[in-house]
Structure formats: C-alpha cells, structure tokens
Amino acid sequence: MHSNGFFLKDVAGFLGGYYTFIAIMNGVAALILWRRKNQPGWAMVWSIVAGLTMVLAGLALSGSASLVPSLPLSVRMLVNKLSGPVLYTLGTTALFTVLFVFRKFFVKPMVAWTVLNVLLVLMGFSMADENFASIVMKPDNVPIVGLVFMLAFFTWVATSQAVVNDERIAQGLPPMEKLNDEKVLVWPDLVYTELICMVAVSAFLLVWAIVLQAPLEEPASSVKTPNPSKAPWYFLGLQEMLVYFDPWYAGVVLPSMVVFGLMAMPYLDFNKKGNGYYSIEERKFSYLVYQFGFFELWITLIILGTFLRGPNWNFFGPFEYWTPYKVEVLNNVDLPQMFWVNLLDRPLPRAPQGAGMLTQVGTILLREAPGLVLLGAYLVLLPPLLAVTVFRKFFAKMGFVRYMIMANLMLLMLTLPLKMILRWTLNLKYIVSIPEFSLNF
C-alpha cells in the first residue's frame, strides 16, 4: 500500500477529470432547461451545482490530503462497522420496496437527476479512500460500476413510461405507445441507426481497451491460487449462492429452474393486458416477482461478490482493507442436530455397525425426518394452501397445472432468501444433510 499522500497524488488527475465531467453534465442540463424546457429556476440550480463541482475538481487536482474532498474517517469507519451480508440484503430489499412504493415521485426527471448527482458526488468522495478506490477502480470491476448506473437508468426510463401509461389508462386514454404506432422501414432507417450505433460502440470499446490496463493474467498454477478466487462477474451470483447451498442445487438446479421459468412464462401468463406497452398497475404481480428475482436475487449478489467479498470469501466493508488474515467465527449447525441433539437432547440416530442397506436408509430417513417433513410441507402443502387464500384468483384463472408450476417455481426462487435468513438468524447450514450420498439442502 502507498501512503495516503502518495495515493492522493496518483488519483488526483482522475478525480479532477471526474468532477469536471459532473460539472459539464450539469452545465449541459442547465442549458437544455433554460433554452428548450423554459425552466430558468432549475437551470439556475444546476448551474450552481456545476460551479460547485468545478470547485471540487480544483481541490481534487491539488492532491493534498487536506484539500481533496473525502468522507470523514468516522463515517467510513461507521460504514465498515455496519456492513455485513444481513444489512446489505435487508438494505437493498428496503431500497427496492421504497422505490416501488414511491415510484411516481422518483421517476420525476428533476428528482432522478438529483439522486444521480448525489450518488456521483458520494462516489467521488469515496474514491479519495485508498481501499475503496483499489476495488472500484480495478479494471476488471469498472464494467460492474457501469452496470449499476446503466441498470438504474434503463429501469428509470421503463418505470417512468409505465407510470405515464398507468395514469393515462386510469383516465380512459390509450397508452403512449398507441399514439405513435407508425411503422418505420428497415431500410434505410433502422439499418442506418444500427450502423451508427455499431461504429460508436466500436470506437468506445477501442478507447476503453487502450485506457484501461487489463492484460491477461499469468497461466494458472496449482501451487499458486489467487485469494480471493472469484468466478467471472456473471457467475458471481452463483458463487455467492454456494455459501448457502451445495453445488448441485446452487449451480445446477436453481439456474435450470430460472431457464425453465423464463421459457414457461408465456404459457403461464393469463393476463391479456400490458402487452406491447409499459405498465405496472396492469401487471403488478409479474412486475414485482421479476424485479425481485432479477435485482435482489441476481444483480445485488453480483455487486456483493465483486465489491464486498474479499480474501477467503470474507465480507469486507467498502472502506476496509482486504487482509487475508481476517478470521470470522462460524458455528453453523444442521437441522437434524438442532432437532435431535439441541431440542430432544438425544444423539443423532445411527445405524448399527454392519447393518444392511435397508436399515441404513431407514436410519437416514429417521435422522432427516424433520427436514424432509419441512420441505414436504413447503413444496407440497403450501401451494394448495396459497391457492385457497392469497392466490385464489390466480388458481381460478390458471387452472391446476399452470398454477402448480407457477407456485413451485416461485417457492423454489424463495428458497434462496429463506435459506439466507435461516443462516443469519439460526446459524442453520443444512435443512437436510445426507453426507452418505453427498446430498445436502
């Protein structure tokens, strides 16, 4: 590690350019609001913000520890202390809920622009910390930072259009897509647009490859493994799931169920509304399930694995140094042990020495009875119970087969957050543990 002074001098040029970019971005926004939108008040606000960020750029270019804008040490230490998988997951879930409930507020352009500026400035302040910058500015991780902002942008675009359409439909008006349904010729309109995009993206990738130094790593060696040893970014969600499940389930069953669910979705859908245009009110259940599965159970796991999982796959705060000597005490137990040993104060059932196959299988079934009963109730009894309560209308419209497929796919999806909660609250490792056949759940 460098000393903080040397680090700030190294990163000063980048931070100066970063704040200058924010200033130009707000200056352009102020010009558009003044000339085209006739909103001089907001134009003045963003002009002031542009001026303030130029001041931040000048301070950052100084490279001085006393002048470079940064978060106070007490704030960084508090963030590190509060950081953890539990708070991270609960926080992202709460954020997802707030954004959904108050979506009509957050889709307003000025609100979204304000949130973007706050996030960009906070990131600039955070990058004055060497530990944070070493993770975020790593060439392999830069695309993930872009992924976060691009996902936020496109989600905002889709949600804002859905809010407008929902308001129009409530007023008895057609959605916006119906007002502009003029067909466009593939040649030359579409092809020219795609050609321009192809050239622009190719030029961007060329500059990216030149500026970001990310050469191929040295050949793999069995005597020298990287720590942390991470999968490619698109598999980090699977690697995070391996913390809570065996490979056969986290790496095979769950991904297969995702693919199967996506293929089955058109055949399970009975709602004829919301096709061909953005809408949330007409497809609220589908929207919530998909967004929760995509963002909460996939994207947030990728972000967690990229930025917050360090050596030995331990969890580190965003401003914490990644030391390989960090030790976390784990005291995970299986459900059979909790039931037989902790609850009944009896040893785990064991087959007698030299017992036959049937006796061994019977003993295993007896030992794992609590977990098997629990899983059976979850996957077999819960769907019919939901059919006569929460999903009564769904069952009436979908029929038995389609409803059971939908219900079981949803329950399998929920096994991930449920298992995570059980690990955090009860230190539960496996609900069913059959090491004799390498079968654990």
Predicted stretch roles:
Residues 144-147, 169-180:
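Extended, regular secondary-structure scaffolds
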Residues 2-7, 73-78, 133-139, 168-173:
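Soluble extramembrane regions of membrane proteins in the secretory/endomembrane system
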Residues 178-183, 235-237:
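Short membrane-interface loop/juxtamembrane segments of multi-pass integral membrane proteins
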